[in-house]
Each structure stands twice: as C-alpha cells, then as structure tokens.
Amino acid sequence: VRSRGLGDVYKRQAIYEGSFENTSHGFRPRRSCQTALTQIQDTFLGTKWFIEGDIKGFFDNIDHNVLIGILEERIADERFIRLIRKFLNAGYIENWKYRHTYSGTPQGGIISPILANIYLDKFDKYMEEYAQSFNKGASRRLDKDYRRIKDRKNKLEKKLKSETDTKVRKDLIDKIKGYYRQMQQMPCVMEMDEEYRRLKYVRYADDFLIGVVGSHEECGQIKANITQ
C-alpha cells in the first residue's frame, strides 16, 4: 500500500510542476542549487540591497490542515487526500531530515520535498505578486552629470560632421575623446532613482534571497511584510 501511495504522490506532482514559479529551484526536475545561482546572476542586476531568509523550522511547523487545503484546491480524489493525511500523521514531513547536496536531490525523504514545494508555492506566488506591485518605472533615468557630458559630446559630434578645417576637426575629435573618457568613468544612470524600483526573488528549498533596487527603508518594509 505504501509503495502504491508513493507512486500516486509522484503522479500528482506532475499536476503542480507546470504551475510552480520559475523562482523555485529546490527538488524539481532539471532544477538545482546551481540553477538558482545562475538565475541570481542573470536577474539580480543592479541590486543595491539583499534580504537573505530561511524559513526556520519549516519542516517541523507545516500546518497539516493548511497543506491538505492546498491539495484539495486541485485534487478531488478523497482517497488520495486521506492517504496524504496518513503520511502527515505518521510524521513523514517532520522526520525528513533535509541536507544540502550538490545535485539538489534530497537524502532521506521521498514525499516531503514534493509536499514542501506545493506548500511553499503559495509563498512563491505571493512574492511574485509583491514584486509586481513593488516594481516601478521602465528603467533608471540617466545620471545628471553623465547626461550633461553626453550632451556636450553629441553637440561636438554634430559640429564635426559639417567642419572641413583639418585643425579644427582635430581639436573637436580630441575634445570628443575626452568627453568619452569621462563618460566611461562615471555611472550612466542614477543609482538611487526614486522613480525606479525593482524586487527580485529566488528560492531553493527553505532558503530564499530577495534583491532590491530601492531604499533601505523600503527593504525594512519588505522584511516586515513577508514576516507576517
């Protein structure tokens, strides 16, 4: 019965796999700690602040009724739900000892990582909605000093196109190169643009990382909101 029940769990996993967020990397097909790190490298560009979190004692504090309720949202098979409740009551979640592995494969547990992802998918979706409401602006505005130098360079380049005197052209080219060197040594956009905000989120098992482009005060508010 136990083997048949485990087979049912794996079959049901396919129901959820397609709806899991792209930010979830723990114990999923073709997902690992490495894919989580790659996503951070690719998407946390320009991040000013990091909020690192782990859901302490997560596997010891899963609310069984909440988990069953989440399962019932998509699974109408009462026999399967009863089977999962038996697994929960038998302590399969609490007795599962999570240990990091390079492959991202859980050691010592079978059902727990599947149910944990289903349970934490609610948090992943909450963070996706939170990011959408937090994000502001299409892009950072140009830094004022950078824009001023760029405007001067553009004017000289425009003048250069119509200039025919060799000496004047050389002087213009030297000045343009000077402005270009200045631009390379300064930030092109405003580092703290009040009209631009971004929040990025990645989770691996019960560890997650949030990247914020915004103020320190906004980071404090984010921490307070997700702790609730």
Language-model-derived ranges and their functions:
Residues Q13-G18, N22:
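Charged boundary/loop elements
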Residues N22-T23, R28-R31, T35-T227:
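Conserved polymerase palm-domain catalytic core
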Residues V1-Y10:
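Single conserved hydrophobic/aromatic residue that forms the stacking wall/gate
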